[in-house]
Curated annotation (Swiss-Prot):
Belongs to the peptidase T1A family. This is Proteasome subunit alpha. The lineage of its organism: Bacteria, Bacillati, Actinomycetota, Actinomycetes, Micrococcales. Component of the proteasome core, a large protease complex with broad specificity involved in protein degradation. Pathway: Protein degradation; proteasomal Pup-dependent pathway. GO terms for cellular component: cytoplasm; proteasome core complex, alpha-subunit complex. It comes from Xylanimonas cellulosilytica (strain DSM 15894 / JCM 12276 / CECT 5975 / KCTC 9989 / LMG 20990 / NBRC 107835 / XIL07).
């Protein structure tokens, strides 16, 4: 009689984690960092139709790396969660922490029970009335949640990019300084996905960037995208989604 094939739980979880990490590492990195006027999101994304950075609710935004169809489904679910909670209770009851907890449950359940884990990594951020009140949560493929302070990098070479953000970030950055730091950090990864030496960073064309902010000064919907001159010169009036 043929013996049944056995895989230990430890090996099964390790294989799932390795599978998810490889899928995430193939995606282009996303960086999120706080500045004096809010929270900045930036990634290299040549597509004008497929967004990796999106608005979720009034003062909450979402960024992701990995398989687009998987994190897009999570984004839509997050919007529905926020809309339903805001409608059923109060708009102030919709928080990044609550959304992060909901995502963590979904990611953790899929990781342990489904045939394959989701190949995604997420950031959920909420801008507060002051920089100290800003919230940035990073969610991994297995449902683990990290409360980040100031900045975070996701995707291929995330650890090395995080160290570069550590070196360049400080409290009270202006939007121009934050944008310069974000684009320089993203440019530290070559087109082949390998980390470049310090001082040899690529200059990413503005048309290849997807950048958005949660603007603390906006009265209700804080999310807006940065385009054109605002990216080329690191300053200027942003335009786009969320403007009212």
């Amino acid at each position: 009689m043929t013996m049944p094939f056995y895989v230990s739980p430890e090996q099964l979880m390790k294989d799932r984690a390795d599978f998810a990490r490889k899928g995430i590492a193939r995606g282009r990195s996303v960086v999120v960092l706080g500045y004096d006027g809010g929270i900045l999101f930036a990634t290299e994304n040549p597509s004008r139709a497929l967004h990796k950075i999106s608005e979720i609710y009034d003062r909450i935004a979402f960024a992701a790396v990995g398989k687009y169809n998987e994190f897009e489904n999570l984004r839509v679910a997050g919007v529905r969660y926020a809309d339903l909670r805001g409608y059923s209770y109060d708009r102030k009851d919709v928080t990044a922490r609550g959304l992060a907890n909901a995502y963590a449950q979904t990611l953790g359940t899929v990781f342990t029970t489904e045939s394959k884990p989701l190949e995604v990594e997420l950031v959920v951020a909420e801008v507060g009335d002051t920089p100290e009140a800003d919230q940035i949560y990073r969610l991994s493929y297995d449902g683990s949640v990290a409360d980040e302070h100031g900045h975070v990098a996701m995707g291929g070479q995330a650890e090395q990019l995080g160290k570069r953000l550590d070196d360049g970030w400080r409290e009270g950055l202006t939007l121009t300084e934050a944008l310069d730091l974000a684009t320089t950090t993203l440019g530290a990864v070559g087109t082949d996905g390998q980390l470049l030496a310090a001082g040899s960073e690529r200059t990413i064309d503005a048309g290849q960037l997807e950048v958005a902010v949660l603007d603390r000064a906006r009265p209700r919907r804080a999310f807006r995208r940065l385009h054109g001159a605002a990216l080329t010169h690191g300053r200027g009036a942003p335009h786009g989604e969320g403007a009212r």
